[in-house]
Amino acid sequence: MTQREEVDLPDFCRKPTLILGCGNTLFGDDGFGCELVDYLERNHSVPEAVCLLDVGTGVRKLLFTLCLSSVRPGRILVLDALDVGRAPGEVLEIDPAEIPPVKLDDFSLHQIPTSNLLRELEVHCGVEVRVLACQTGPLPGEVRPGLSAAVRAALPPAAEWVAREYFKTD
């Protein structure tokens, strides 16, 4: 890669750590990842080595860019909502390799291409990939912005986990 090409790369390719907030804030708890990015920006100091992005439902294009780039972060954390039958507001870490094939259709990382791209980045590109997800309550059938009380209450502890794991400046 030429020096000019490297300069033209977006920050999300060049920073050592990339944190992606995924979801649709127009559909209730599905906006957890985006709301968590906003909470982190307002309540924590984001280190220079971390690129923190609210990517909404546009995560696939960004992941394709990373897969095709010769320069990429060493680690990626995806923040998202999911429904795996737990209590609304429960936050859990999911290993992308452990998403059961039967659950790929249900997994809310905005569907199969995203899950496959995360595995591609991990297995073939050497990127450490982690997923922090929050169990949603029932999602609305029509546009209804805002998190439920249970999911909103999960923001501070989830943000503390992210800060502890990714904002350390040893």
Per-region residue spans from a language model:
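Short N-terminal or domain-adjacent regulatory/targeting segments
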Residues: 1-13
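Short hydrophobic segments within beta-strands
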Residues: 20-22, 132
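Phosphate-binding/catalytic loops
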Residues: 114-170
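Nucleotide and nucleotide-moiety/phosphate-recognizing core
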Residues: 12-19, 27-29, 34-97
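Helix-loop-strand module that forms the ligand-binding subsite of alpha/beta enzymes
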Residues: 82-128
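A short glycine/serine-rich beta->alpha loop
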Residues: 22-26, 103-106, 144-146
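A generic local secondary-structure boundary/capping motif
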Residues: 7-9, 66-67, 118-122
